[in-house]
């Protein structure tokens, strides 16, 4: 029936029912179309609400890590509102359940932010000096970058638990280290992002995801200090007797199986360390200039001082042989004039020392030697002194900004192309649970109080510092010369030929009680710098 027929007046005896029925059917048809359009719009809305919520949550995560807590709280609130509105009309049951879990998680985090930061700030007016993560470090937050910037980068290698990544734009490489985020944020542990720390690798940027924080770190090309010292060429030019092929192979086996053996730079290779070692051992052709200078000096004695290391005419090379061992506090005989060396133990002895860690039984009081172990290397005290000064400045700056290392060990000491020490990056994040390397604890690199119930102070790092210097100066690990562990009554074993300033420094650093260690307490770092061992160091020049 046409619309024209409907508009014609009804004839005599005819009812208008056909016209009304047609009009009713048309209305029903239009209503069906409207319903279909409305349903399609709702489906689009259901899909869009997840996108809108994800945008808000992403902004909340960025602001959260940047410690802009008020903005983070607002973004979390907006994201939750979007999810609440969308979840009620979402027809997918599984998706609704997943969204409800996310809502609970984001509400919990928003509540933590309010209780830990906003409520305290609004109620009592927190001072900007109440924590290292407040206004004092505000400029460092500009390093926060969008996670999407990492997507175009290519992983070219894996070293321990970090990735070597290549920037496609520049072709340069950098290190990416991921830190897992915990859902419960500590109120006592503030986020501290150190900057301006001398002799420490630089944090270039950082990225935040829902579950992790990714650190974009400078790639120090020189590798670890220990990898250079343990390399075959360094064994030869350090003056160690090469001996027979069998003896040389045994030393190489011990080196390869030791804790400090660096990882091969191969994609997909994973190891257990949680710090950032760099390159495998280098040959003499690729040694840093500082070590090349030392190699030449050993081959042809010269009065010309190294361009990198300070000169001390009275020092004796470390790692010389000894007929007996003096305990800490005893006088020292003059250092021998010829290069003799300890007889190093086999690989089984080295591994046994590393495996024992801190035992409960103290070493024998009548022990008269460090065993039949041979020093891993022989270094001039001036070299160790320079590296020690650089490490000291790095630790001083970290402590000033409120960061403790807790497990400083050989994996954290890198060597740049100029021969200077570079610490791996240390920081602190409120949402990242601090973890201490168990291997560092077992091998006596961590202080005795680490892992206990007492609160840690800067003194724990000065123990680690002393343990590393002990190994650099003597050529033997502290755990190797003290295989039964270190207790309050343990006497520090020192070689007879060690200089008096070096022996004094090690004795004062390796004190079982934290408060008795050199460097602990107020003004401790100044006292450490003033120790006779550093008498030839020009601190202002190192800082420049």
Swiss-Prot record:
Domain of life: Eukaryota
Signal peptide region: none
Enzyme class: transferase
Keyword field: ATP-binding, Kinase, Nucleotide-binding, Ribonucleoprotein, Ribosomal protein, Serine/threonine-protein kinase, Transferase
Residue ranges annotated for the Protein kinase domain, each copy included: 145-534
Stretches assigned to the MIT domain: 87-115
Claim: Cytoplasm is one of the keywords in the record: no
InterPro entries: Intracell_Sig-Traffick_Protein, Kinase-like_dom_sf, MIT_dom, MIT_dom_sf, Prot_kinase_dom, STK_RPK118-like
A Pfam family annotated for this UniProt entry: MIT
Annotated active site: 407
Keyword Transferase in record: yes
Binding site for ATP: 151-159, 177
Catalyses which reaction(s): L-seryl-[protein] + ATP = O-phospho-L-seryl-[protein] + ADP + H(+); L-threonyl-[protein] + ATP = O-phospho-L-threonyl-[protein] + ADP + H(+)
SUPFAM superfamilies xref list: MIT domain, Protein kinase-like (PK-like)
PROSITE patterns noted in UniProt: PROTEIN_KINASE_DOM (PS50011)
GO cellular component: ribonucleoprotein complex; ribosome
Chain segments carrying region Disordered: 262-344, 353-372
Biased composition (Polar residues): 303-313
Family classification: Belongs to the protein kinase superfamily. Ser/Thr protein kinase family. S6 kinase subfamily.
Protein name: Ribosomal protein S6 kinase-like 1
Species of provenance: Mus musculus (Mouse)
